[in-house]
Amino acid sequence: PKAGVWISAQVMKNSDDFKFRFYDEVAKRPAWLTGVCHAPWVSHTMKECRERTPMDLPIRSYPDICHLLCCQYPVHAWDPIWAITAGRECYNPRPRWHRQMHRLNKPYCIGNLAYSEGIADDVSKFIWLDADWDDSIPYMKTLQDYARMFISPQHAAEIASTIALFEDIYEGPAVSNQAVSEVYKQLHVLEDAMHAESYEAGYGADSYRFQMPRLMSTFYQYIQRRAIRDKAVFDGVFQGLDEASDMDAFAETIRTRLAETAVSPDEALKAELWSLGDVCWEKINWKLSTTRHFSPDYSRGGFLDTADIPLCNAWWLEANLKKLSGMATQAEKQTFLKQLRDCHTAGPGGKYISFGSPESMQYLRMEKTWWEEPEAITIPRIEQHVGMFGPDVNRETSPDIDKTTLERVSSILGYYHAPVKIEIDGLVPGAAYEVRVVYPMRFGWKGQKDIPSYITVDGERLAFLGCVEGDEWVYRYALPAGKVNAEGRVTLEAQKDVGPRGTGFTEVWMLLR
């Protein structure tokens, strides 16, 4: 009878009306109300939550510490390669960012009860616990204590610095990230050193808390090698197209070239990876795959299943090559193949942007940085849509495999009321353009005339021209002459009607008319 209740403004289909009614009820102070929670899928910041909650009612934070994408605190600007492989629930130490999240939360709440879904966020649990105990403790001290307690007192500093280095893997292009090999090498050196020393069972190199980063570093090393190889294959797949006369024969050449992406780039490293996975399964029942470790799904921590997927647009190209059989002439087939080759270009005076590329970040216009607001509620975020690259996708029956490219994994997405603005340069001053847009894939806006989103320039809504025939994910708009300024720049804003959770951009083409 003396129990109290904590309530949260979490709701999947949010609206301002719900928010206002929620806090109206909080203000009535029912006798059973003990406090308010701030958690994932609350449509407003903790600061606003505190401002709307009576000051004598405490607020408790429930941060999501276990996910890297489609979550409360995503890894912003994550390379699509990592998103489709490591995925949402891999081993995910983020000490630097999690301490920043805690620092931003602290003024508005009485403490944190982290939302966890298992062992993958093991390091983050200690980062948050230590910060709640004493927020003056540097996160490197927390990592050293963690390593000293659970792995090796002799190597606490080296282990801590190596775990911290995982965050550098999340930044920049996967194919050129030097932190990948650095972490892998450092953990090998530490393993050799600890094997030469004496530890009780379950400590040193035998500690599962050491085997977890060992496995993850091996995974990143393997995926990077695969990504480098697959990129090289795809970069050369259309070589010779302009000179070819027999398009059916050239299509077979493409298939032969793409076949290399189905082969492991390093069998020894792959064997090491799966061996470590088996060790972690035996030690702690870590469900790393659906085939050997009983994960319910690859997206629920079974990320080892992604080790064999091609890390280029091989599936997309193979699906489109099948369309050649329905074309009558060599000229028609060659035109189609050239369209596939050039689909991510915009022609003279134009511009193509995919928000999975590091270069795309230069076009974003935000009032704050992600470091200042990692939850990205009042500012847009980079959101990842990875389902079409899953190892469980049936490439024969999936209706959109011929439209699924790496360029469509990442979106700049504004939830709720976050403005989504991009300033595009390099255009022809004063010229008219056709603007082509792929919206965030998670909303499923494909070929619909009445979607609750649209594009504006200088506050004026652009005229909708329909969708691209054959690829209805692409929406077409008319940018009138005079909107591109004298410096060759124009600012596009993705807007939404009242109701949907958000909007944004995945791909943008600016085609000179």
Give residue ranges: language-model regions.
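Catalytic-core regions of glycoside hydrolase
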Residues: 1-156, 160-161, 242, 246-312
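Generic structural hydrophobic/aromatic packing signal, biased to beta-strands
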Residues: 7, 36-38, 59-61, 114, ...
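Surface-exposed beta-strand edges and their flanking turn/coil or helix-capping segments
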Residues: 20, 50-51, 72-76, 125-127, ...
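A broadly tuned preference for mixed-charge, low-complexity surface segments
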Residues: 23-27, 90-95, 157-179, 490-498
